[in-house]
Amino acid sequence: MSDSKETKALHFVQKMLEQSSEDKGLRATLRLAANPNTESRAWPVLIRWGVDVSGPEKDAYCLVMALAARYTGKTDGTLSLGEALRECFANDNESSGASSRLRRLFTCDSVQEAKLVLRPMLSLIQSRIPDRLCLSELLEDLIKFNREWSR
């Protein structure tokens, strides 16, 4: 992945966190991106960022926008998805919960399918370890999801 894409993802997440913490209307709009039936109401935000709302990147950005709206702070987390799942299940005797969720994610063939699998996973992570997941890393991973060399 190019540095410009990484920079764009990082900048996007930082701006979404910053702006949604200051603007309740924007926060409400970003939350709509989580639901496929209402995500089109958040598309103007994506269009301003130059995201093709008819392309596969739209799903990655919508998922991360909706999660950013649920963050309480203005800073991105530091944990990768795997690390966050491991922390969620740290007190369990087995790590089967985390590993089964990751295995299910690995079987996904598209960003759209990954989005459906990730939504409940991300809700669990946000409820157990709030604001610790690195959204910019998640966005970068989802953007390159369909490229064979990255899987």
What is each residue range found by the language model?
Residues 2, 8-66, 71-151:
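Basic, alpha-helical nucleic-acid-binding regions used in initiation and control of genome expression
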